[in-house]
Amino acid sequence: MASIHKDILIDAPAHDVWDAVRDFGAPHRRLVPGFVLDTKLDGEARIVSFANGTVARELLVDCDDTRRRLVYAVISERMKQHSASVQVIAEGEASCRLIWIVDLLPHEIAPYIDGQMDQAALAMQKALARSAKVESGFAADRALSRYRGSK
């Protein structure tokens, strides 16, 4: 099983970021506009239409306002397993961290999902704050960070 971790520092108050994350039916408007084009609620699930043409059914597993943590699972024939959690942690009054973890099978699709998460993180940064930094558990992301730091 592959596990992908994203740690996104956002220059916005945690309560504002959490409000966008927990709005399960509106990621296309509030959280990742441009990356997600449309979302339709279907009971405890949402049907998400992505800009790349992919459509995914995401089942809401848990939404915990106290811990600012949302958990969802993707229901797909392509994947045996896809569970994700998003947690918003305050870093002072004006900034926060968004911790996004995805566990999936088959592990061969991890590079694709990792790339999609990077694109989503950029859309999040644009929507939620003008200045944000993404830290990833993948070596390619660390190399890119080092490259950018050398300029």
Features from the language model and the residues they span:
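Glycine-rich portal/gate segments that line the openings of hydrophobic small-molecule binding cavities
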Residues: 25-78, 83, 119, 130-136, ...
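Beta-strand/loop substructures that line and gate deep hydrophobic ligand-binding cavities in soluble
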Residues: 74-127, 135-138
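Beta-strand secondary-structure signal
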Residues: 5-7, 47, 57, 71, ...
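Hydrophobic ligand-binding cavity/cleft-lining segments
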Residues: 1-40, 145-151
